[in-house]
């Protein structure tokens, strides 16, 4: 699906319209990825607000969460769902998905906050991530938040090939990654948020199940 816009580029309405249509293209291609992106958007919105981000900035980061895996819609299912180890070429294909998403978002004049977060959400604090091998503070802050929330949702969501971790187990796994995979300060804030909001995981699942599948904004406009 190619988004068809009638809003003026650079406006909030334009941003929302583009993200809505791109999120719908993810849903049409792969409902599992769409639901993952929705939950990550909810989680990163809450984390950003907990860390003191202004409401508007947090919601913009949530939009990045909503389409952070957009690039996977160009990766063949045979690669995405492959149960065995990936070949070098297949791994390179997977590792290009943030670049492909960012290029499309750039073409639609999305804000830098969204572009940076989507492009860099697989970078690691120790510099061993992709696509650019950024390290430490060179990684955009929004991407550092998005990375933690992305991994949290992956490990707490059941899949046919793995059981879901409990919140306690996931909390420990995220903490183990502080200073290597993740920004230690973001991890510290995230664990405090989990302690302060025992319903954190449930909230993401509740929004997913209770809201209209064609309205990806319901959770983000709920005042959280």
Language-model features: locations:
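Metal-dependent catalytic cores of enzymes that make or break cyclic nucleotides
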Residues: 5-224
């Amino acid at each position: 699906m190619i988004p068809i816009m009638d809003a003026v580029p650079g406006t909030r309405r334009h941003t929302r319209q583009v993200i809505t249509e791109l999120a719908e293209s993810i849903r049409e291609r792969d409902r599992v990825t769409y639901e993952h992106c929705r939950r990550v958007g909810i989680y990163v919105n809450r984390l950003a607000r907990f860390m003191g981000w202004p409401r508007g900035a947090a919601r913009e980061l949530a939009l990045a969460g909503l389409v952070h895996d957009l690039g996977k819609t160009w990766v063949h299912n045979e690669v995405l769902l492959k149960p065995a180890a990936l070949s070098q070429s297949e791994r390179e294909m997977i590792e290009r998905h943030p670049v492909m998403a960012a290029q499309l978002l750039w073409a639609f004049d999305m804000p830098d906050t969204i572009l940076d977060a989507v492009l860099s959400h697989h970078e690691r604090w120790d510099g061993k991530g992709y696509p650019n091998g950024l390290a430490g503070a060179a990684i955009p802050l929004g991407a550092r938040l998005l990375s933690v929330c992305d991994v949290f949702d992956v490990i707490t969501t059941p899949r046919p090939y793995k059981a879901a971790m409990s919140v306690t187990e996931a909390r420990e796994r995220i903490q183990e990654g502080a200073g290597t995979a993740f920004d230690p300060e973001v991890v510290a804030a995230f664990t405090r948020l989990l302690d302060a909001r025992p319903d954190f995981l449930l909230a993401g699942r509740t929004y997913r199940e209770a809201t209209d599948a064609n309205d990806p904004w319901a959770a983000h406009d709920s005042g959280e």
